[in-house]
Swiss-Prot record:
Keywords: Cytoplasm, Methyltransferase, rRNA processing, S-adenosyl-L-methionine, Transferase. Gene3D superfamilies: Putative methyltransferase TM0872, insert domain, Vaccinia Virus protein VP39. The keyword Ribosomal protein does not apply. Its EC number is 2.1.1.199. S-adenosyl-L-methionine binds at G99, G100, H101, D118, Y145, D169, Q176. Its main location: cytoplasm. This is Ribosomal RNA small subunit methyltransferase H. One of its GO terms (biological process) is rRNA base methylation. The gene is rsmH. Transmembrane segments: none annotated. It catalyses: cytidine(1402) in 16S rRNA + S-adenosyl-L-methionine = N(4)-methylcytidine(1402) in 16S rRNA + S-adenosyl-L-homocysteine + H(+).
Length: 384
């Protein structure tokens, strides 16, 4: 869709946000800019709109939950199947962060229990403080999302058919971006860390200073889809022979010098793909996701739902493939009837990937690249 004008976003944006989303300061909208700030959500395949106010609590914690109402709409039918207030239902927030999504679910459904997972101890502490008013209805667990099955087992739940909903909000959080010392942002000079869990050993500096040129090139190409991966890798190896990489500024300077000027002018920030690749490698994000999605689907009771928000194509490809396999029939394609036991155990409840609309992007630039997909587990036909 083309827009005839570009207007400024309704609130100031941090340098780190602009570094990851450089177009965020120009959010197209035909709405009245004097109106009170609101978020709206639109399914990319429908014309229905819904508006909600942005919570002051979200602003206080430096993070506005993405597609909040739409996530609730998708998961609520599973959470209220037995009771309208969610009594007896269990939701796993596999990427707890500041707890914005969880707070909304606990507020809307006063009988619901939420298990929140996060690898970042700082985020977990913030969420526990924020969600303390909900008492025992919230349980926080320090683990990556691929530790979902172990977390359930440790809390006394079965690892299969025991929960009613699972929510994933993938990628780096706004809180992490805004903490310069974490090293996620390339707009400020900071230590080359990038660990989401400070207890992990591997850092971005370790990768830059110890991987061979071939290994570096593979990381940049696979996780960053960087066209100039080998050129960058060779230059990293050459420079580190004289001085090890310790600061993000060193790497950004190298990237400006290595990536051709024509690409720098048209391809976005030259550091974007390299920083993404290093972050994914440091935190084993794709490997974790490939384990976590099947575990989440296995944990669902019949009628349970899982919703996943992905922010870049590598994540979305994994989610799309897992959901496609789960919703496909195993019967031969030329048979006129479904064979017993071959019907899919899941059905799609989003038509492809849903997107945030322009008004939400104006208020919350982090929502611009999001892709939201959801599936529901149907009755186990093998036992029917």
């Amino acid at each position: 869709m083309a827009f005839s004008e570009r207007t400024r976003a309704a609130r100031p944006l941090s340098d780190t946000t602009l570094a990851y989303f450089p177009d965020a300061r120009f959010a197209p909208s035909d709405r009245d800019r004097a109106a009170r700030v609101r978020c709206t959500y639109q399914c990319s395949h429908t014309r229905s709109w819904r508006a909600v106010a942005v919570s002051d609590n979200d602003s206080r914690y430096g993070h506005i939950p993405v597609m909040l109402d739409r996530c609730y709409e998708l998961l609520a039918p599973a959470l209220t199947a037995d009771s309208t207030d969610g009594s007896g239902a269990v939701l796993v927030d596999a990427t707890l962060g500041a707890g914005g999504h969880t707070e909304h679910f606990l507020t809307m459904l006063p009988g619901l229990t939420v298990i929140g997972l996060d690898r970042d101890t700082n985020a977990l502490d913030i969420a526990r403080s924020r969600l303390a008013p909900f008492g025992t209805r919230f349980v926080g667990v320090h683990t990556r999302y691929d530790g979902l099955a172990d977390a359930l087992d440790g809390l006394g739940y079965r690892t299969t058919s025991s929960v009613d909903g699972v929510l994933f909000d993938l990628g780096v959080s706004s809180m992490q971006l805004d903490q310069a010392e974490r090293g996620f942002a390339y707009s400020v000079d900071a230590p080359l860390d990038m660990r989401m869990n400070a207890q992990d050993e591997l850092t971005a500096a370790d990768i830059l200073n110890t991987y061979s040129a071939v290994e570096l090139s593979r990381v940049l190409s696979r996780f960053g889809e960087e066209r100039f991966a080998r050129r960058i890798a060779d230059e990293i190896v050459r420079r580190r022979a004289n001085e090890p990489f310790t600061r993000s500024g060193q790497l950004v300077e190298l990237l400006y010098a290595t990536i051709p000027a024509a690409t720098r002018r048209t391809g976005g920030h030259p550091a974007k793909r390299t920083f993404q690749a290093l972050r994914i490698a440091v935190n084993a994000e794709l490997e974790s996701l490939a384990t976590a999605i099947p575990a989440a689907m296995a944990a669902l009771r019949p009628g349970g739902r899982v919703a996943v928000m992905a922010y870049q194509s590598l994540e979305d490809k994994i989610v799309k493939a897992e959901f496609a396999a789960a919703t496909a029939s195993r019967s031969p394609i030329d048979l006129p009837v479904e064979l017993p036991g071959d019907a899919p155990e899941f059905t799609a409840i989003t038509r492809g990937a849903e997107r945030a609309n322009d008004e939400e992007i104006e208020v919350n630039p982090r929502s611009a690249p999001v892709r939201l997909r959801a599936v529901e587990r149907v009755a186990d036909r093998r036992n029917a």
